[in-house]
């Protein structure tokens, strides 16, 4: 018997993320009315803001129609428009709760939220039962290939169907689904990494391989130019749960040239805007890496609340990209400075110069390095670890609760230094010749440069308090520098 005038409330179940809602149904002499799904009220009670895009109705003409058990690659919000069902849900996601069962009855005064990967089944208990549900992805043949099934009659599940299954109407397909012991857990949504051949992209791939993470796809501009709108058509984005954007245009001086100006805006602003749009449309978490160049460097230490004030084209394009990504509901922006990773970089160059100065056969006897820009190094392996920490990975294949979405400053920890000071550390470790590094101002260093030069922030130190409050401890950049230099 349907209960009227209940308060809207939610009840957790023994399956993580599976939520039962009591709905408020208002009846009178004409019939009844209910708010079947109310985003603001229900998200306030704990319903994920799952972004439904399609509404389906299953009409069951006769009592005893039974359907399932199907785990589908989307979230569902299920209710009944008329009649009553007995529902059984089975967790078919990898993890400790795999195979866990929950059952209940639904009439128009109840609803249930079924997270992606939880198997769904029901039995109509009345003639003319209308079962209705919202989903947050459009059905496609590609999606159907990812379904996972379990047999309704599996004795291991031991579902106590009110009407014996041999008296029910089932499809031939549902009769022949595998038992739980033979069922394949539903794989999580995929993760795409863009810019995979850059310094950070290679560090992310190394982290994935080292930790045995599954479901990752790596693309660079030759396979997916994320700044080209037409190239988005090659992917079924409903299959992806996370995008990690490690791609960017980083030639800060060349960005001041006419051709560099166009390239920087394309890669650093248009590309992230396109990624943000597709991420918002498909409930994808977007990870994006920012730069200290979005600030003018007037403050000695910058935090996440500081307004943008870029000095040059590169910084302007990075700020524009940050603004676009910030409009994506599920986003992480990690702001870095002075990035060092696999490939050409400042430290590798200083090691080479130190070796030359130490070589009596080489005419080079000293080098000049800028001493009026202050900051901290960011090593790409540390940045990769921070990204996965925010996403909920804790050195295990299975993620835990991710951090709150938003912007996080992320560099190495420790005292700040100038480029000249860092160069001296490398020279001393390599050949004990740090005294051969001579300080100059930025203006002096670029005085004889013929091409365009991008303005640099004088202070690039970022406040690490916010990311440290998530439990992540950035590595001390000087210790990382010593370890890295020792490998060169």
Model regions and ranges:
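Non-catalytic, conserved peripheral segments adjacent to functional cores
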Residues: 2-106, 126-130, 135-189
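C-terminal amphipathic/interface module of NAD(P)-dependent oxidoreductases
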Residues: 166-189, 455-488
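N-terminal Rossmann NAD(P)H-binding glycine-rich loop of SDR-like oxidoreductase domains
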Residues: 190-211
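Adenosine-cofactor binding site in Rossmann-like domains, unifying the SAM/SAH pocket
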Residues: 215-234
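NAD(P)H-binding glycine-rich loop region in Rossmannoid oxidoreductase-like domains
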Residues: 229-267
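Catalytic helix-loop patch of NAD(P)-dependent Rossmann-fold dehydrogenases
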Residues: 263-274, 294-344
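NAD(P)-dependent short-chain dehydrogenase/reductase
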Residues: 326-375, 380-389
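Mid/C-terminal beta-alpha module of Rossmann-like enzyme folds, strongest
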Residues: 386, 393-451, 483
């Amino acid at each position: 018997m349907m209960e009227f005038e209940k308060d809207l409330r939610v009840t957790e179940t023994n399956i993580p993320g599976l939520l039962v809602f009591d709905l408020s149904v208002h009846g009178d002499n004409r019939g009844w009315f209910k708010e079947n799904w109310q985003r603001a009220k229900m998200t306030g009670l704990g319903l994920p803001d799952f972004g439904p895009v399609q509404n389906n109705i299953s009409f069951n003409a006769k009592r005893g129609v039974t359907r399932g058990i199907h785990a589908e690659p989307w979230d569902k919000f299920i209710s009944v428009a008329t009649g009553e069902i007995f529902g059984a849900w089975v967790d078919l996601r990898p993890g400790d709760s795999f195979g866990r069962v929950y059952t209940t009855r639904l009439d128009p005064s109840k609803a249930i939220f079924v997270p992606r990967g939880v198997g769904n089944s029901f039995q109509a208990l009345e003639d003319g039962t209308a079962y209705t549900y919202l989903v947050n992805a459009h059905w496609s043949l590609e999606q159907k290939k990812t379904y996972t099934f379990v047999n309704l009659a599996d004795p291991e599940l031991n579902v106590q169907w009110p009407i014996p299954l041999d008296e029910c109407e089932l499809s031939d397909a549902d009769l022949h689904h595998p038992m739980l012991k033979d069922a394949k857990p539903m794989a999580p949504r995929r993760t795409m990494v863009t810019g995979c051949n850059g310094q950070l992209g290679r560090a992310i791939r190394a982290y994935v391989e080292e930790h045995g993470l599954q479901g990752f796809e790596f693309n660079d501009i030759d396979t997916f130019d994320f700044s080209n709108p037409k190239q988005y058509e090659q992917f079924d984005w409903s299959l992806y749960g996370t995008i990690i954007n490690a791609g960017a245009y980083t030639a800060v001086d060349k960005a001041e040239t006419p051709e560099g100006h166009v390239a920087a805006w394309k890669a650093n602003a248009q590309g992230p805007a396109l990624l943000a749009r597709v991420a918002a449309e498909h409930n994808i978490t977007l990870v994006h890496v920012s730069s200290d160049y979005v600030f003018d460097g007037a403050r000695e230490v910058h935090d996440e609340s500081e307004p943008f004030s870029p000095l040059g084209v590169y910084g302007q394009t990075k700020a524009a990209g940050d603004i676009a990504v910030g409009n994506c509901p599920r986003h992480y922006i990690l702001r870095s400075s002075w990035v060092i990773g696999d490939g050409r970089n400042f430290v590798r160059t200083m090691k080479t110069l130190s070796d030359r100065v130490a070589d009596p056969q080489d005419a080079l006897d000293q080098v000049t390095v800028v001493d009026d820009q202050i900051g901290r190094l960011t090593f790409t392996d540390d940045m990769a670890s921070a990204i996965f920490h925010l996403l909920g990975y804790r050195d295990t294949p299975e993620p835990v609760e991710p951090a709150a979405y938003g912007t996080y400053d992320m560099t190495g920890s420790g005292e700040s230094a100038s480029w000249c000071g860092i160069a001296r550390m490398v020279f001393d470790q390599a050949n004990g010749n740090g005294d051969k590094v001579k300080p100059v101002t930025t203006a002096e260093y670029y005085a004889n440069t013929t091409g365009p030069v991008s303005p640099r922030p004088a202070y690039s130190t970022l406040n690490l308090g916010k990311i440290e409050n998530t439990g992540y401890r950035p590595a001390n950049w000087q210790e990382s520098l010593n370890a890295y230099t020792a490998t060169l």
